[in-house]
Regions:
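Short, glycine-/small-residue-rich phosphate/pyrophosphate-handling segment
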Residues: 97, 110-172
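Beta-strand-loop-alpha "switch" segments that mediate conformational coupling across diverse proteins
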Residues: 173-178
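N-terminal beta1-alpha1-beta2 submodule of the flavodoxin-like/Rossmannoid cofactor-binding fold
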Residues: 1-114, 180-219
C-alpha cells in the first residue's frame, strides 16, 4: 500500500524536508511511498460551475472541467492509500494553492453524497462510481511557519484538516512546525525530525484499516 507525501512549500525547504522524513519512516514500516511538490502546478480556484456534481448526477464519473493541473494531484490522491500533507503558513493560514485544491476536491468527492449516489446506481444497474472514491485513508498534517509565535500560524492546521474532512480521511497525526525562520533547517532540530518521522509511522501503521480502527498519534 502506498503513502503519498504532498508538499505545498518551496522545493527543498522545510515542508519538503519534513514530508520526506515522514515518508522515510513510512517506508521503513513497509509502505510504498511517493512524493510530490506541487508548487509549480497550476491549480486554479473553483468557479462554482457545478459541472462535477452534474456529471455525477447524470451517471458519469466525478470530473472537474477546468483545464489546469488540478487533475494531476487529484489522481495521485485517489491512487494513494494514505497521505502526509505539508503546507507553509505565511499569514495565519496555509497558502492559497492548498485552499484552491480543497475547494475543488472536497465537495466533488464528498463521501456522504457519493455513498448515496453509489447506492442509487447499484439499484438502477448503472455504471458504478470509481472505487477509489470510497477508500478509508489515514492522513497526517504538517503546518510549517516561520513566525516565532504560534498565533501567527494559528489557522494552519485547522484549515489543513479541511483537506480530508468531506472525503472522510482519518487524521492520525499532526505537527505544528512554527518558528522555522530561526531554526533555518528542520534537520538541525532532532526532536522535530523525530516527530515528523512519527507521523509517517502512524500513517503506515493505519494503512488498510477501517476508519473506526485507525488510531491517532502525535500532538
Amino acid at each position: 500500500m502506498k503513502v503519498l507525501g504532498i508538499s505545498f512549500g518551496r522545493k527543498g525547504h522545510c515542508s519538503d524536508i519534513l514530508t520526506k522524513e515522514a515518508l522515510f519512516e513510512a517506508k521503513r514500516c513497509g509502505a510504498d511511498v511517493e512524493f510530490i511538490n506541487v508548487i509549480d502546478l497550476n491549480i486554479g480556484h473553483c468557479t462554482a460551475c457545478g459541472a462535477c456534481g452534474a456529471a455525477r448526477d447524470r451517471g458519469k464519473q466525478v470530473k472537474c472541467y477546468r483545464k489546469d493541473d488540478y487533475h494531476i494531484l487529484e489522481e495521485k490522491v485517489l491512487d494513494a492509500d494514505g497521505i502526509v500533507l505539508a503546507a507553509p503558513v505565511y499569514a495565519v493560514a496555509p497558502v492559497g494553492q492548498l485552499k484552491n485544491f480543497i475547494d475543488r476536491f472536497g465537495p466533488a468527492h464528498d463521501r456522504a453524497a457519493l455513498n448515496k449516489e453509489q447506492e442509487r446506481r447499484k439499484k438502477e444497474g448503472m455504471e458504478l462510481l470509481d472505487a477509489r472514491y470510497f477508500k478509508d485513508r489515514p492522513i497526517a498534517y504538517i503546518s510549517v511557519g516561520g513566525a516565532i509565535t504560534q498565533n501567527w500560524v494559528s489557522m494552519g492546521l485547522p484549515i489543513m484538516h479541511l483537506f480530508g474532512m468531506s472525503v472522510k480521511m482519518k487524521s492520525v497525526g499532526r505537527l505544528d512546525a512554527y518558528d522555522m525562520g530561526r531554526t533555518a533547517n528542520p534537520v538541525l532540530d532532532e526532536k522535530l525530525m523525530s516527530r515528523a518521522a512519527a507521523l509517517g509511522r502512524s500513517v503506515a501503521q493505519n494503512l488498510g484499516k477501517p476508519l473506526e480502527e485507525m488510531t491517532f498519534a502525535g500532538d
